[in-house]
Design a protein with these regions (language model features):
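Active-site-proximal loop/helix of nucleotide/amide-processing enzymes and allied scaffolds
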Residues: 2-26, 34, 67-69, 79, ...
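Solvent-exposed, charged helical/coil patches
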Residues: 16-54
Length: 168
């Protein structure tokens, strides 16, 4: 998803801006594709790793905003960090959720070191996101940490502070 395409222009700049309408089509296809792959934490983690986080050498936090059926309606990278930490603002997470009219969110972030084991800070952040979400009536369906070689950690699958199978 890029905003600039290289082409030969009369002014010699070599760049053409894509109209915002064109970008919306790309975002819609992106979200539509993700809807098919959110069935399990593993599939969702694989999709986000492959299409958004890739092999980033920095921690990224991604919010997937969902409708009442758990289908993705909006995706955003809400924070970019360093090689071993990322300060994800709960305000930024919920700003994206509110603007997109999300009923639920799924958080993803990567550990560039490859080990998806959550840190105490990861657990604290997940708990705080769940608590703020309860106040705003926006559920946290899961928080998934992506490691390397397909390794991931799902708070929901592990019934830890941020997630449980019933969303409570």
């Amino acid at each position: 998803m890029g905003a600039i395409v290289t082409t030969e222009m009369a002014d010699g700049s070599g760049h053409t801006r894509i109209p915002i309408v064109g970008l919306q089509i790309v975002v819609d296809r992106y979200v539509e594709y993700l809807r098919e792959d959110l069935a399990t934490s593993r599939k969702a983690a694989e999709w986000v790793e492959r299409n958004i986080i890739r092999r980033s050498n920095r921690e990224l936090v991604v919010a997937v905003c969902c409708d009442s059926g758990g289908r993705a309606t909006y995706i955003d990278v809400v924070a970019k960090g360093t090689v071993n930490c990322c300060l994800a603002s709960v305000v930024e997470i919920f700003k994206v959720a509110i603007i997109s009219n999300a009923v639920n969110i799924i958080l993803f972030h990567n550990h560039p070191c490859g080990d998806p084991t959550p840190s105490a800070k990861d657990e604290e952040t997940t708990k705080r996101v769940r608590e703020v979400g309860e106040l705003l009536d926006i559920g946290l369906l899961d928080h998934i940490i992506i490691g390397s070689d397909g390794a991931y950690y799902s708070f929901m699958e592990n019934n830890v502070a941020g997630g449980s199978p019933d969303g409570a």
